[in-house]
Amino acid sequence: MLDIAVADAPIRDYATERLVMDLRQLTPNLAVSPQIDLPDVALLARSGFKTLINNRPDDEDGAIDHQLMAQAAADAGMEYHYLPLRPGQITPDLIHGFSVALDGPKPAIAFCRSGNRSTVLWALGQAGKLSEAEVLNTASQAGYDLSGVVPLMRSLAGASR
């Protein structure tokens, strides 16, 4: 069991090393989050996360350079994937890369500015595997409205048949 508490705003309790962030569980092996700070990476690893997926482009306001994140992940013993998704620029390579990252060590934590783009990549990777209702419900329970990507999900689900 991961020692994680969910909060409205990311905070850290360094005295007990208990991670308290806005982590949202999508599956037993995947949580998504808004921007993760460098010190959080080691805490995530100590909390049990094995893979870190960064969906935030370096040039986005407030983003931490992906090379610094990669080093923090390596120092913490985590697998790291940099899959930057700019709003509205979803590609088959990003969807595939996200799915491949999820096949790595588990559990994984994926982040972007709000967690929405990470959730979108997960959802699109589930097209044809889970029902549309299951995907939308899972995202909704985590606080994300994916109605805008339903047409793409349907297209991908049809292509996977």
Predicted regions mapped to residue ranges:
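A phosphate-binding catalytic loop at a beta-strand-loop-alpha-helix junction
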Residues: 109-119
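Cys-dependent protein tyrosine phosphatase-like superfamily
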Residues: 2-109, 123-161
